Amino acid sequence: MPQQLALMRGVPFVLQTAATATGNGIVVAIPPGFKNHTFHVTGSAGIASGVVTLEHASDPLYAGTWAQVAAPVTPLASTDLVTLATGVYNFVRARISTIVVGGTVTVTVTSD
């Protein structure tokens, strides 16, 4: 198994960087004591469409359908959208489920 990245309390972790294409992004492990999670979905100028789905699973290599942390997020141009989630998650990712058109999207998560 490849090396697994884990969050540090209160330190933002980038799950997607200036992304446009559909894909899972980076999977990060959440330490068991971290229950409050803040996801920032930041759209660049010019975004016309796209969807980011915030997901979690019990295994970083899980090949099935990951569970949604919250409702899918439609990034907006030059805007930082915040999604708050509470729960015990083993692994999270920010999957671009619909291609981003006209700009890029960056997604970060911070947990404690």
Which residues are covered by each model-predicted region?
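Short, surface-exposed beta-strand/strand-loop-strand elements in extracellular ectodomains
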Residues: I47-A63, V107-T108
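A generic structural motif
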Residues: T42, E55-A57, S97, T110
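Short, intrinsically disordered N-terminal pre-domain segments
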Residues: M1-L15, T106-D112
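Noncatalytic modules at the cell exterior or secretory-pathway interfaces
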Residues: F34-V41, A85-T104
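Surface-exposed ligand/attachment interfaces on beta-rich extracellular proteins
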Residues: L15-P32, S44-T53, P72-V82, V100-T104
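Surface-exposed loop/edge segments in extracytoplasmic proteins
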Residues: V11-Q16, L61-A71
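Intrinsic-disorder/low-complexity, polar/charged segments enriched in Ser/Thr/Lys/Arg/Asp/Glu/Gln
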Residues: M8-V14, G25, N36-T38
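Extracellular and organelle-lumenal recognition/adhesion modules and their flexible linkers in secreted
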Residues: P2-L5, V28, P32-K35
